[in-house]
Amino acid sequence: MTTTAATGAENPGVHPRFAEALRELGIEDLVPQVRRFPEATRTAAEAAAALGCELSQICKSLIFAAWGSPLLEHSRELGGGVPVLVLMDGASRVDLELVRKELGAEKVTRARADVVRETTGYAIGGVPPFGHRTKTRVLADRSLLGHDVVWAAAGTPYTVFPMAPRDLVGHAGGTLVDVRELTA
C-alpha cells in the first residue's frame, strides 16, 4: 500500500476539525505533509507497513476512562469515568496500572467507542493527539522520544502526519510519563 498527499482533487483533504486545530496551533503548514492511505489503517502495524517505517514510529492516541482521581475533575461523581488520552508508541502497550498510579485514580479502563467519539470527535483508528472536541488530560509515554519523527493519525483511519515527538507532546499539552507495559 502506498500513501499520497491528503490534498488535491482525488483526495478530499484532512479532517476539518483537525485542520482547524492545526490553524489554531499556528502549524497549518503541516497540512501538505499529511499523508493519505488508499485503505483504512486502523492499527499501528497497518500504518507502519503502509508508511514503511518502524512500528515504534507510530504514535497511538488511546482514550481511557479514569475513576476516583483527585487530579481529574468529575472523576468521583457517580458513573464519572473521566476520559484521559494516552500517547504511546505503536510497538508498545499501555500498562493500565501505571496510568492508574500516575493519575492517583481508583480505576482505569479502556474507554468505549462511543466515549472516544464523544470526547474527541473522531472514530477509533483516526484519533489525533490534539484537536479534540473536549479538553482531556494527556499522558505521553517517553518511548515516543526514541525517534526524530513519529507519525500520528490526522483525524481519520486514512490519514497520518509526521512530527517531532517533543513538538507533538507539546501541541497535545501532554505530560511525559512512563506508562509502557514492560515485557518479562
Feature-to-residue mapping (PLM):
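Extended, low-hydrophobicity, polar/charged segments
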Residues: M1-A184
